[in-house]
């Protein structure tokens, strides 16, 4: 029986033969969105776009929105106009994260020229599943880059937050000038995320130039930045497009209730909150008022500095190269890092919280048992999918909570909190190492120790969110892991003279925070990563490299599924594949501008691998340490890892080789004492890119055709010895 398709002014008649599949009751869109993929639903809504977005349509009622795509097997003729009220029937489908009805099994146009739903006013960070398929509005948006709109994805920012818009090839905005000033952006919240499961990729789809409204109201033109952190208080600073008041609502709870600031009009705003006390957590929201308009910042939890000035120390479990030190030699605890961890646990006098992915070391477990014996309250969280066989040696008085609903790597944290309530003895142990024999003794890892009460209290908040309460025993019914967690901790801490940032995954947008720092690197980025599959961070590295930043690193496995290794090396970035070594390179760190006096030397480290799952489903902890001494120590560790590939190494004996110039460009002169039989240049993946036979002690290589970057020089001498050295070609 043929499908009846509406002529202008007519409605679709659903054929009798389809009725058995369509007898499910009419649903509002919010209810329909809860049904299983593949369920046939019937919904009614107002169409919020026309052909400007292609053949897809978005429908919205008073409860939610949804996409409708007339894919293969759809009835013909589905092309309703914006403002029409339409009833649609079809199965639910998930397309790269976007929930849609596809195919269209039947539809009726019920009415036309209806007013569109009012857009939901939100911030970039509030784009998400709750508003997918709905009209949204983000005020005070600035587009980056200038020029004209390209097809594909572009980025906009508002109140210091970033989000994408997407324009398909046939969109009317493609080729139009990008607004130079602030605009209020209107569009439909959509999603494009190829991950499994898809949890990100939310974007705004403007429908035309009318969705870019010049902003005539006061808006924030920057994020709210916490500065001047002291034990007594801190200052919040921000800027607006128009002159308005400088005010902050604040309080000990999210209800706020107290106010500070000035009504004097200004564009650059600064409000000091004082009298708060040391290691105090305060909820605050900055805002500026101009007439009847108010520009709001986000409500955020902030911390004052601790009463006792703290410090940051770093210990590595493998060799370091102190010859490159610019001040403080790095500490290598070869074979004894478990003893170092146990020694800090021995400091605990009142409380000890442990959240570690996997444990097989009895020295550490013994130190925890000793802490319990001297009256310390001990709590432990671990990943339930792991063996954790050393936990069988824990005293029965130590409660252990396992995360058992674990996609990805699950409870992947590696941290210990000691005496968080003691201003003089509060410590946090973090870094990349699990408490396993392999991680502690073989696999290159780092241990970061921070003595600071405010940071310890923040880590305790995170621990107790997973623990399910504040008591000595876990409350599994209340515990939150993974995507159920909230962004409930401060992020900036003044530890002595060092600024330390703290982020927990997946609630805190850790990948975004890492990218923000990569985007402002001035001169150098060194990486030591277990895995690199996160495309957002890949793109940041590519952009930094294109901007002249020297990007180089070591990655444990270049061939891991989804690896970005070869994308980066093909762009000229110096990366080394560690997979040939028997141990795992387990680090997750980046060093930025370690020797740049005009930059901000910092280190990003913790449990957070540079992967999609680390940012979206795993429990992770990350520290960003702004300190030139710490950056210098990590660079000493990184140099030792790099030297495993590129330092002068020799097979079958010893003997020096010399190269000139450094770096080389059109040519490279190589000299070896015992005479050269053959010289080879290998790129960072081990591929031979140049080979020359030699007869004397010196050989000239022609290298103009080679790409700039790092190479391994391999020299075979007459004696039979083979020497290797790192060489660099100038860009």
Task: Identify the function of each model-found stretch.
Residues 215-306:
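Short, surface-exposed linear motifs at loops/turns and structural transition points
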Residues 1, 7, 15-19, 249, ...:
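C-terminal outer-membrane/trafficking sorting elements
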Residues 26-217, 293, 381:
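OB-fold single-stranded nucleic acid-binding module
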Residues 305-378, 385-398, 419-663, 672-677, ...:
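Charged, low-complexity intrinsically disordered terminal segments
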Residues 27-29, 214-222, 643-666, 731:
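Residue-level detector of functionally pivotal "anchor" positions at catalytic/ligand-binding pockets or at interdomain
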Residues 41, 232-236, 664-668:
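Structural beta-strand segments of beta-rich domains
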Residues 179, 273-281, 703-709:
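Surface-exposed, short loops/turns at beta-strand junctions within beta-sandwich domains
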């Amino acid at each position: 029986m043929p499908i009846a398709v509406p002529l202008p002014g007519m409605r679709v008649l659903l054929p009798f033969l389809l009725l058995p599949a369509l007898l499910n009751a009419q649903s509002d869109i919010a209810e329909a969105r809860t049904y299983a993929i593949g369920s046939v639903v019937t919904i009614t809504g107002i169409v919020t776009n026309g052909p400007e977005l292609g053949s897809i349509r978005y429908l919205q009622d008073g409860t939610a929105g949804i996409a409708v795509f007339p894919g293969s097997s759809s009835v013909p003729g589905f092309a309703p106009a914006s403002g029409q009220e339409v009833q649609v029937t079809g199965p639910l489908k998930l397309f790269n994260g976007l929930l849609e009805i596809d195919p269209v099994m039947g539809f009726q146009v019920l009415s036309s020229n209806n007013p569109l739903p009012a857009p939901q006013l939100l911030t970039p960070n509030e784009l998400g599943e709750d508003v997918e398929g709905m009209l949204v509005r983000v005020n005070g948006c600035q587009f980056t880059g200038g020029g004209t709109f390209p097809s594909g994805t572009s980025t906009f920012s508002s109140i210091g937050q970033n989000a994408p818009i997407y324009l398909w090839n046939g969109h009317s905005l493609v080729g139009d000038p990008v607004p130079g000033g602030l605009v209020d952006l209107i569009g439909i919240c959509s999603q494009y995320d190829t991950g499994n499961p898809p949890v990100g990729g939310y974007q705004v789809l403007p429908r035309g130039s009318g969705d870019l409204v010049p902003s005539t109201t006061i808006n924030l033109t920057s994020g709210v930045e916490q500065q001047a952190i002291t034990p007594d208080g801190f200052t919040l600073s921000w800027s607006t497009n128009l002159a308005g008041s400088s005010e902050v609502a604040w309080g000990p709870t999210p209800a706020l209730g107290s106010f500070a600031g000035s009504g004097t009009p200004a564009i650059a705003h600064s409000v000091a909150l004082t009298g708060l006390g040391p290691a105090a957590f305060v909820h605050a929201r900055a805002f500026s008022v101009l007439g009847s308009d108010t520009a709001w910042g986000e409500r955020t939890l902030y911390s004052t500095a601790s009463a006792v000035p703290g410090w940051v120390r770093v210990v590595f479990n493998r060799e370091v190269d102190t010859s490159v030190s610019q001040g403080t030699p790095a500490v290598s605890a070869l074979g004894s890092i478990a003893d170092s961890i146990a020694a800090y646990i021995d400091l605990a006098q009142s409380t000890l919280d442990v959240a570690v992915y996997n444990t097989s070391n009895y020295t550490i477990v013994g130190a925890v048992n000793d802490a319990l014996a001297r009256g310390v309250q001990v709590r432990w969280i671990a990943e339930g999918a792991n063996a954790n066989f050393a936990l069988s040696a824990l005293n029965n008085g130590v409660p252990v909570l396992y995360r058992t609903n674990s996609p990805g790597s699950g409870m992947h944290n590696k941290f210990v909190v000691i005496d968080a309530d003691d201003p003089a003895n509060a410590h946090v142990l973090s870094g990349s190492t699990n408490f396993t024999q392999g991680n502690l003794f073989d696999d290159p890892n780092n241990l970061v120790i921070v003595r600071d009460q405010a940071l310890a209290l923040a880590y305790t908040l995170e621990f107790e969110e997973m623990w399910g309460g504040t008591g000595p025993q876990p409350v599994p019914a209340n515990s939150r892991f993974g995507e159920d967690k909230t962004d409930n901790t401060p992020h900036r801490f003044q530890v002595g003279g060092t600024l330390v940032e703290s982020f927990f995954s997946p609630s805190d947008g850790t990948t975004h925070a890492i990218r923000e720092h990569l985007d402002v690197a001035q001169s150098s980025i060194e990486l030591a990563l277990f895995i690199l599959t996160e495309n957002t961070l890949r793109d940041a590295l590519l952009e930094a490299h294109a901007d002249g930043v020297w990007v180089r690193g070591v990655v444990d496995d270049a061939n891991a599924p989804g690896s970005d290794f070869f994308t980066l090396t093909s762009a000229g970035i110096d990366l080394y594949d560690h997979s040939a070594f028997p141990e795992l390179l387990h680090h997750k760190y980046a060093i930025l501008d370690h020797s740049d006096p005009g930059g901000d030397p910092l280190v990003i480290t913790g449990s957070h691998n540079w992967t999609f799952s680390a940012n979206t489903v795993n429990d992770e902890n990350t520290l960003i340490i702004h300190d030139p001494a710490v950056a210098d120590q990590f660079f000493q560790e990184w140099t030792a890892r790099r030297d495993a590939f590129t330092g002068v190494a020799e097979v079958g004996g010893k003997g020096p080789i010399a190269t000139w110039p450094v770096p080389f460009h059109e040519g490279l002169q190589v000299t070896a004492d015992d005479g050269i039989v053959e010289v080879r240049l290998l790129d960072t993946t081990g591929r031979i890119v140049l080979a020359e036979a030699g007869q004397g002690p010196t050989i000239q290589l022609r290298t103009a055709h080679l790409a700039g970057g790092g190479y391994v020089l391999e020299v075979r001498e007459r004696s039979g010895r083979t020497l290797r050295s790192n060489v660099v070609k100038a860009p």
